[in-house]
């Protein structure tokens, strides 16, 4: 062993630390999954702010109806999708399993559910746009159906990955908890 002031111990070249300085795999995985989920939550926050801005602009009549269409019915319950993301963020500091489970279930209910309903709600108008090339709602000159379907595709991917990574994180925390209980 080396001392602060003295010479290095004989037979040691300083590379004998690798067997001692390892972080357990489940801690690495937990940290990386938390990081991925946080990125997805921030992406969800951007989508949420875009939808909220569109709703505010149309309801407050800040611009004409020709520029920003009135919101669809699925957009109102989708605004509640911020709550599951907050539960997910609150679960991270102390590895709170119950908050993460609440986040996963309510993400399906408040995020994926309205998106599925929105797909069904807008399908007849999308069909009309495809068949006849006529759109009646616009967002800054683009067909509102096309814009909202694009937003929905991105949102479904974000929420799907969020649920997937949350499940993997939950499994990681749960196996770690079970190992502690066995000891």
From Swiss-Prot:
- Family under the similarity heading: Belongs to the jagunal family.
Q: Where is the signal peptide?
A: none
Listed A to Z, the keywords are: Endoplasmic reticulum, Immunity, Membrane, Protein transport, Transmembrane, Transmembrane helix, Transport
Residues on the membrane's Cytoplasmic side span: 1-39, 93-99, 159-183
* Physiological role: Endoplasmic reticulum transmembrane protein involved in vesicle-mediated transport, which is required for neutrophil function.
Record membrane topology: Multi-pass membrane protein
Q: Does the keyword Membrane apply?
A: yes
Q: Where in the cell is it found?
A: Endoplasmic reticulum membrane
Name used for this protein in its record: Protein jagunal homolog 1
Q: Which residues lie on this side of the membrane: Lumenal?
A: 61-71, 121-137
In its keyword annotation, does this UniProt entry include Transmembrane?
yes
Q: Where are the transmembrane segments?
A: 40-60, 72-92, 100-120, 138-158
Superkingdom? Eukaryota
UniProt-listed Pfam families: Jagunal
Mind giving the lineage of the organism this protein is from? Answer: Eukaryota, Metazoa, Chordata, Craniata, Vertebrata
GO biological process terms, semicolon-separated? defense response to fungus; endoplasmic reticulum organization; granulocyte colony-stimulating factor signaling pathway; neutrophil differentiation; neutrophil mediated immunity; neutrophil migration; protein transport; vesicle-mediated transport
Question: GO terms for CC?
Answer: endoplasmic reticulum; endoplasmic reticulum membrane
């Amino acid at each position: 062993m080396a001392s602060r002031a003295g010479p290095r111990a004989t037979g040691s070249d300083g590379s004998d630390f690798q067997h001692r300085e390892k972080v357990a795999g489940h801690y690495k995985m937990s940290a990386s999954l938390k990081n991925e989920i946080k990125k997805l939550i921030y992406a969800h926050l951007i989508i949420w702010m875009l939808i909220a801005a569109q709703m505010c602009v149309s309801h407050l009549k800040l611009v004409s109806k020709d520029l920003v269409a009135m919101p669809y019915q699925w957009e109102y319950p989708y605004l509640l999708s911020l709550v599951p993301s907050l539960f997910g963020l609150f679960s991270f500091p102390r590895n709170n399993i119950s908050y993460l489970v609440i986040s996963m279930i309510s993400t399906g209910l408040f995020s994926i559910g309205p998106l599925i309903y929105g797909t069904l709600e807008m399908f007849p108008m999308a069909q009309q746009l495809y068949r006849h090339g006529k759109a009646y709602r616009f967002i800054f000159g683009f067909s509102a159906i096309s814009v909202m379907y694009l937003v929905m595709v991105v949102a479904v991917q974000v929420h799907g990955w969020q649920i997937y990574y949350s499940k993997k994180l939950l499994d990681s925390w749960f196996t770690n908890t079970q190992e502690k209980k066995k000891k």
